[in-house]
Amino acid sequence: MISTVKRGRPTKQNVVVEFDSNSVQLFRGSDLTFSDSLFEPMTTGTELDVILSTEGGVMPGTNMMLAGGPGSGKSTIVLDMLSKFTQQGLKVLFVSGEMDEIAHYKYCKRMPHIDCVQTLFLKNYSNNVKETLEFIFNEGYDVIAIDSIAEVLEMYKDAYRTTESAAELWFLGLQDKHKKGGNSRNYYTTFINIQQMTKAGDFAGSNRLKHMVDAFCHVTRSKDGLERSLYFSKNRDCDKDFKVFFSIYNGGVHYAFETANQND
């Protein structure tokens, strides 16, 4: 008996999605209620505060993106911010998907003031990244930084054999939940997400990731490496248009700002 093998694309299967029309709700702004703590900025005490929000500083319940090329200074800026928040008694977490313990230790030796930042080395939990992050985030934090989105999504896809789209939906949904205080201590968590840019200067991620954040910050470095800057192309919490220049030396980060529309 000769067996035959069917070739071509597999037959599409219809997926039945249950929908309850009674679950759909409409709101007016007057219907919404949140704590007034949403309007209390978390300040760094640096020039960064000017472009982070109109009030001056990072606002609670916000998710922002820091995007830039390799070596532009993204991780350094974020760790510098987190160290200043930690020293004020805020509860922060740095989720490191790229650096391991040795790399982070060397980083702290070069910049001693960041060694106070509580850090999760996500590579140690790559087989259960979903469960790990959901457990840790539920502890409640003022600020959580993700370094980087690309690494978290890749770990999720590998661990659960799923698609980029499914990984993004989980990732964005998790942040949305905790922004709104959906954790054991009702923190309106702010997320600072790090993402790479390609050598051509394009965003290395989907449009969904780019547009579903409250603020998008570009971190740049000149070809000769002498000038670094950051500016927001989108920031729902700030009405100012400034570019902040920064340099890294003597174990610290030093900032100065200028209006973005001035000639460089």
Model-derived regions: residue spans:
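Short, flexible loop motifs at catalytic/binding sites
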Residues: F19-V24, G29-D31, F137-G140, E151, ...
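Short loop/turn elements that form and flank the Walker-type P-loop nucleotide-binding site
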Residues: M59-P60, Q88, N138-G140, N186-Y188
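The Walker A/P-loop phosphate-binding site
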Residues: I2-R7, K12-M111
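Phosphate-binding/switch region of NTP-binding enzymes
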Residues: D176-D264
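Short beta->alpha connector loops
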Residues: S72, S126-N128, M197-A200
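Catalytic-core regions built around general acid/base machinery
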Residues: M81, A166-N183
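A short acidic, amphipathic alpha-helical/loop segment
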Residues: M81, T132-E134, G173, G205-R208
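Conserved inter-motif catalytic segment of the P-loop NTP-binding fold
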Residues: G69, Q88-G173, T259
